[in-house]
């Protein structure tokens, strides 16, 4: 699931 890290990163204020 490629969008999951982006979503989590967005919530945390960064993107992996």
UniProtKB/Swiss-Prot annotation:
One cellular component term from this protein's GO annotations in UniProt: extracellular region
Taxonomy, superkingdom: Eukaryota
Cell compartment(s), UniProt: Secreted
Tissues and organs where the protein is expressed, per its UniProt entry: Expressed by the venom gland.
Keywords annotated in UniProt: Secreted
Protein's recorded name: Cryptide Pep-14
């Amino acid at each position: 699931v490629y969008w999951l890290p982006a979503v989590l990163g967005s919530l945390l204020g960064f993107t992996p």
